[in-house]
Amino acid sequence: MMDELPSVSCSEEAGVRYLHLGDTPWVQGCMRVRKPYAVELDYVQRMLAWLLWHDVTDRAALQNLHTAQLGLGAASLTKFCLHSLGSTNTVVEINEQVIAVCHSWFALPQPDARHRVACMDAMHWVQAVENANT
């Protein structure tokens, strides 16, 4: 793991909560407080383009998906997959502060049978043989 990970901070404006890393105003992710499962940022919406290759009306098929997310951000993708798709999800995040802040401030659910959060370097997770079919 990296020796020095950036600090995590939050800001909020006009009903949108933002996640920042380090001492910068740059946004890593966000959540509309009144719609915590909605995907707010355009670039995060584009990350869901893979759904174009799936029949989104087939709920059973979506619930059989297992998504892997390398980096948590503000947990937008994770919450969307859990809430809207009902899929199983594995998230790999190197910064334990990001995980803690997402639980406290961004409505990230606690891990369960459908939702796993691994605090580790994503490179090591990808290289692990047991994750080959995820």
Which sequence ranges carry the predicted segments?
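Rossmann-like AdoMet
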Residues: 1-58, 82-84
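The AdoMet/dcAdoMet-binding core of the Class I SAM-like
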Residues: 36-134
